[in-house]
Amino acid sequence: MRIEKDNLSSYVYLPSEEAKEGWSQLSVAEMLSVNQTKAKEEFRVYEEKTCDRFQVVKEHYKDMRTFQDLSFVNRMYEKFHTFDKAKMTVWEAFDKLGNYVDSSDPDIDLPNIEHGFQTAEAIRKAGHPDWMQLIGLIHDMGKILFLWGLPSDGMEGTATGKQWALGGDTWIVGVPIPSTCVFPEFNDLNPDMIKAKKIAEETADLGEGSQGEMYEKNCGLDNCKFAYGHDEYLYRFLLHNNCKFPPEALAIVRYHSCYPWHTKGEYRDLMSENDHHLLKWVQEFNRFDLYTKDNKRPDMVALKPYIQRC
């Protein structure tokens, strides 16, 4: 990809001396692309003393573990994967998401569309391909589900509403949930976990960390089902519409919220050889998705013309 000079506005972060620690191993391009006003360790901190919306975030994950199981995911597949709810352009969809704030995110209070611009602009400045910049912009667009979802399905569109089937860290359903998930104390509330423990008691050979009999070893993540939300919806939407993205882009869309996999090293026994290649791209994307989160608003008017040329 050839990066051209332009007059687009960009972020100029002025890091504190404390925040500079931990960034020393990043390249110059990377340092220009992340929010250095916070230390790396200050992102994704799920503690009441550091998170203004801690109770909302905590309740989100409690609900997510309680209600997100294999049967729920299958029901959402049937309900939403006909893709017949509406027809709109990307920019019309963004307008619908204009006031949507993710209730599961401890790092940012801005509407999701603004985070999309933050991510895309950071990827552009780092010199990554056009397709990755575009994925950065739309990676959370699946949250448009709130227009058709029900509160009982965890699909409210308000910042303090029930969003447990729209956003948040995902995991593979139908098998025990890893203890490396955020708020692991809620894992025992999950129907899949309850079922797995019952099987373990009956057979005495299935414990946490085993993937049980639902998935074969090295079956590939494309054959697994994940906790339902914006990732899965957008992934299936792109496939349904035969969008011309490379496999790496589709993997980013589907797996970017699965922190147990791309950050904590879980599910390695389910991965195919190709998944190891895709993992590197998801991890690369995650740096821009996570470390650009900042309540400094991007200039979307200035950035939009460039995005439209991608």
Name each model feature, range by range.
Residues 58-61, 65-68, 80-84, 98-101, ...:
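Generic secondary-structure transition motif, activating predominantly at the C-termini of alpha-helices
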